[in-house]
Amino acid sequence: MSATGLSPVRCAFVLLLALCSRPASGQDCSGQCQCAAGKRRACPAGVSLVLDGCGCCRLCAKQLGELCTERDPCDPHKGLFCDFGSPANRKIGVCTAKDGAPCVFGGTVYRSGESFQSSCKYQCTCLDGAVGCVPLCSMDVRLPSPDCPFPRRVKLPGKCCEEWVCDEPKDHTVVGPALAAYRLEDTFGPDPTMMRANCLVQTTEWSACSKTCGMGISTRVTNDNAFCRLEKQSRLCMVRPCEADLEENIKKGKKCIRTPKISKPVKFELSGCTSVKTYRAKFCGVCTDGRCCTPHRTTTLPVEFKCPDGEVMKKSMMFIKTCACHYNCPGDNDIFESLYYRKMYGDMA
């Protein structure tokens, strides 16, 4: 049959095959790398910043169900890959999840690799049966200052995220009781009453690790810098490895193992990247009587990670010196454990 005799449906099918078989725009990697100049690209919450397929530029990874090419890869941290299907010469595919267990969250079933908003405050991703969430609202901390001695977060009508407001002082000095509300623990660091070049140096405590096992995040806020400006500092933290069966190490007649001994040095992993060095790190143990064990004294050290694409990044990380076992544990149903604080006697760095 001649081309002119094709039905409209067959014409559309032939056109679709032609589009899927031709190379995607900008697919050629033979030329020199040309990346957009300026600031480092910012991706939406929960979307990874990855190296493109040509090994040139960093871009926001494609998500589940989105179109992808060899140059525009899918998000590897969510177990996604670009499924080109058939015929074999197709250059455009669809981001598909590798085989993994689905997740049940709030009565809804999500596929492995699927992202969703659990509420207006959190963006979540299902990955092989586990749900991980990142906050969509600002997690900043505002320290007391002369122009705002009593800051507090409030829920405003029509808005999802809480915002900071400044209350008027009520028979308090600027620094005393107001500052105490933000120092939930003693710290080895700058003296909060120290004046330096017209700057009242203030540093909050490190928050508890966002995860009870595996790699998490701990944060604090300080103005201990040359410009006396508030800045948020973060560090990686690992209270204990998730795969470790620590209960079997509890001695007979005891109910806790506070700081178990790790038999061999370990390498830390972060988003597919591995620490360059091995570390003989300390971790917190477990109890069989309902208590939980958390870091008591810590220090912060830089750790270098090497990624599969060759990039080397340096991150600050918490290293445990001592642990304490106690009954002040987070709730069993608290999936956002980053909101949980346990008193720690400071960072010794």
Curated annotation (Swiss-Prot):
Q: Start and end of every CTCK domain?
A: 256-330
Give the VWFC domain ranges.
101-167
> Has UniProt tagged this entry with the keyword Protein transport?
no
Q: Where is the IGFBP N-terminal domain?
A: 27-98
Kindly list the GO molecular function terms attached to this UniProt entry: heparin binding; integrin binding
Q: Where is this region: Heparin-binding?
A: 247-349
Which SMART domains does the entry link to?
CT (SM00041), IB (SM00121), TSP1 (SM00209), VWC (SM00214)
Which cellular components does GO assign to this protein?
Answer: extracellular matrix; extracellular space
Q: List the disulfide bonds.
A: 29-54, 33-56, 35-57, 43-60, 68-82, 74-95, 256-293, 273-307, 284-323, 287-325, 292-329
Where does the signal sequence lie? 1-26
Q: Where in the cell is it found?
A: Secreted, Extracellular space, Extracellular matrix; Secreted
TSP type-1 domain residues: 198-243
Major subcellular site = secreted
Biological process (GO) annotations held by this record are: cell adhesion; DNA biosynthetic process; positive regulation of cell differentiation; signal transduction
**InterPro entries hit by this protein:** CCN (IPR050941), Cys_knot_C (IPR006207), Glyco_hormone_CN (IPR006208), Growth_fac_rcpt_cys_sf (IPR009030), IGFBP-like (IPR000867), IGFBP_CNN (IPR012395), Insulin_GF-bd_Cys-rich_CS (IPR017891), TSP1_CCN (IPR043973)
Q: Which UniProt keywords apply?
A: Cell adhesion, Disulfide bond, DNA synthesis, Extracellular matrix, Heparin-binding, Secreted, Signal
By sequence similarity, the record places it as follows:
Belongs to the CCN family.
Q: What does this protein do?
A: Major connective tissue mitoattractant secreted by vascular endothelial cells. Promotes proliferation and differentiation of chondrocytes. Is involved in the stimulation of osteoblast differentiation and has a critical role in osteogenesis. Mediates heparin- and divalent cation-dependent cell adhesion in many cell types including fibroblasts, myofibroblasts, endothelial and epithelial cells. Enhances fibroblast growth factor-induced DNA synthesis.
Q: How does it assemble?
A: Monomer. Interacts with TSKU.
This chain belongs to the protein called CCN family member 2
